[in-house]
Amino acid sequence: MAKKKTSTTLTDQARERLKELGYKRIVEDFPLFDPLGDGSMNATAELAALDGDEPVILFASAARGEAAKAPVQDDAKFRAGLGAAKGKPFRFVWVWDSDNDFFFDLEKDAQIPSLPTGAKWRSAARPISDSRTRLVQEVSAEYHRGDFRTIQRKFDELHEAIYSRGGVKPTNAAIDELGKLLFLKVHLEKSSGYTLSTGLAKGKRFSDIYSAEYVRKRGKAAIPELKDAFREINNLAQYRAKDITGEEHTIFSYDEPLRLENPEILALAIEALELRDRDGNPIRLSVPDRELLGNGRRSRVLRSHLIHEDLLGWAFDVFLRGKYASDEGLATYLTPSQVVDCMARMSFGDIAESDLWARRGDKDQRERWNPKGGAEASLPAFLCGDICCGTGRFLVGALREMKRRILDDKHVGHSDDDKLKWLSLMKQHSLFGSDQAIGSIQKARINMLLYGEDHTQLLKVDDSLTDTHIDRLAGKFDLLLTNPPFGSGKYEDPKGLARMRREDLGLGLGWSWPAGDRSRRKELSKADPAGLFIDRNLQLLKPGGSLLIVLPDGILSNSSDAYIREYIMGTKDPETGEFLGGKAVVRAVVSLTERTFSLAGTDAKTSFIYIRKKRHPADPQTPIFFALAEHVGYLTRGKSELPDPEGNDLVDIAANYLAGPKEIK
């Protein structure tokens, strides 16, 4: 048996590899910067490659098979964020466990395929803005003070306790209970002095009853008090938002109760969410967007006890993927974050800054939005959505990209206040999601809440294909990202299929026909919903809008589905090779391994396609970007997720697309 490589051996090997890349100054146990200035960090880099005084690469070793794990990678990335001095975080991160290499670009907050050489790192690294530098260093300090590698483990333990001993089943209901407790914790931080005005705890400060000590002291008597408190807080005006129907909704249904009945489990849950730093000081879960700019006037105490939203959101995302039961609606398969990130990065990379900052009253936007009055005219014109949103994973991915773009320092024409106001408006008006499962909508609201948004337009519908409220958004979306339900013959609603034949509404895939001969079309009595959702999403896009959609490979290759491909691209002229007709231009096709959705219970072979709705019927089909993702970052063994030693091809795929030739871009 081969002797297991030690961390020291890996460090020595890493030093040699860095030398081969041309780095001359390589320091072991490199002392990292303390942004708080109080000596509390006491953090070091196992190995640091520098160019003069400029920190370039931070290396971190890991035990065999551990390098692919998010907590290990996060620890290295946040160490790199501390950097060598004020304003000097490391630019790149390398995590290695002797079998697996993982490289990250700190400015892009993204995985990269390789490390740059010592001679070329400056050209490979984009300049880091001042506000981004402040953010990276402060967030890194927060991470190391709080040791947030424990958050996801706590979520797992809480779910098990709520499910097995708290009397809350099935598993999705247990997830809802955890979401409710997170919601109450966020409210406590936003309104620490809140006094209850109704229920059994009327007149008491919420902070007094939402504590493990109080619950243990009061026992079962505390349960109805907290149930009443949850009902009151859930219905506060600050957590209400009007959807496109004009109806108000709250984070949870207005009459949804807190279901935990076991006081010991409730106390345990409250205690577990009382996150503290190494000095025992409380850490906040909620982060105002101003803090993301890094230019708020904050005391050292406030600065040191913030938790960045990405840390909590990451933990909840990992937890949700591992626990969510896929038994609601037509099909509920949680899209892995690796796929979401790839699709979001590719699509937002093609969105112009002018589109993100456009107003509905702008000359080139008025026809699309037809605003009524000045207030409506001043709203963002950009609209992104997912009409099969499930737990909101694509909406979270879009929100992350929006924040990254809007808060970027390169917008020299916009003040910090302008950016914050605009981002706030975009959160309310630029994201839309719908789903037929109310449980999924509730989880989407929690997912968005943990990423800093509690007013997203999320709509419970009976059928996203036929919903009349969604009809009002036809022609308005800039971008749709989605993973719809699929399965041959799974959609059988006669009214829905009849509606998908309404050519006056721009719909036509309620028919099928032999490829090349639409005159022989026939009505479908049942259909794969994936094909129908292509049509519905195209209807919702503005001319020139983009759709990125996960599809079963049959739609892309089966002869019986050739009419769908023809509907999208048109028919190919045998003489010119050009496609005639068709509703869209295909930009990219990315084939996914059959393991991609295996944790969700299916090994179906899938791909995602990136198509752009034609602005004019004569728009030509341009060269298509094709890619194959044989590895998506993980393997599965039963219900467990294991790191893929071959890494994540989707990282390279997104980077290659964004760096592609102009005729593809």
Question: Across the structure, where does each feature detected by a protein language model lie?
Answer:
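Class I SAM-dependent transferase core
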Residues: 314-349
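Acidic-basic catalytic patches of nuclease active cores, encompassing PD-(D/E)XK
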Residues: 1-38, 536, 572
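Long recognition/docking surfaces used for binding and targeting
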Residues: 183, 190-324
